[in-house]
A protein has these predicted regions:
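ABC ATPase "signature
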Residues: 157-158
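ABC family nucleotide-binding domain
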Residues: 1-143, 148
């Protein structure tokens, strides 16, 4: 929808509930299985039933190629797998917006493509994504709009062709 998040009358909690966030560190709970990591917020914050949350989580784990890892623990996964689990967790409640903050920066270079492919698939499926990244070739290929920052100030803003081809 069209929600002005700067409007003082806007319900900030409702806005936050419609946003999924993934950080550069995976932030998975080490003592919880993949399935529990993915379902925790849906059950505790959004008050979903365990059955509903687990059904949705298994759909997402299937989508990201991790269904067979549902009972695994984070230390049994590669960095790329952990990041995909973090993305699945962010997608649990079908957010309207997905914020991705340098999600490849903590990964082994061999795993970066795996995560970027997943982001490209999410975009192709219609997910709105705001992504902070240094992966400029990926941004050029996948973005509808690029905003370049220099020292915290917007230096360029436009389509990939406008920004990257200059």
């Amino acid at each position: 929808g069209n929600t002005d998040i700067t409007d003082p009358r806007a319900d900030q909690d409702k806005i936050r509930a419609r946003i999924g966030v993934v950080f550069q560190q995976f932030n998975l709970f080490p003592h919880m299985s993949v399935l529990r990591n993915v379902t925790l917020a849906a059950i505790k914050v959004h008050h979903w039933s365990k059955d509903r949350a687990e059904t949705r989580a298994m759909e997402l784990l299937e989508r990201i190629g991790m269904r067979d890892k549902a009972s695994a623990y984070p230390d049994q996964l590669s960095g790329g797998q952990q990041q995909r689990v973090a993305i699945a967790r962010a997608l649990m409640t079908d957010p309207e917006l997905l914020l991705l903050d340098e999600i490849t920066s903590a990964l082994d270079p061999m795993l970066v493509g795996e995560v970027l492919n997943m982001v490209a698939e999410l975009k192709a499926q219609g997910t709105t994504i705001l992504m902070a990244t240094h992966e400029m070739s990926f941004a050029h290929e996948a973005a509808d709009r690029i905003v370049l920052l220099r020292h915290g100030v917007i230096a360029e803003n436009g389509t990939p062709a406008e920004v990257m081809d200059e």
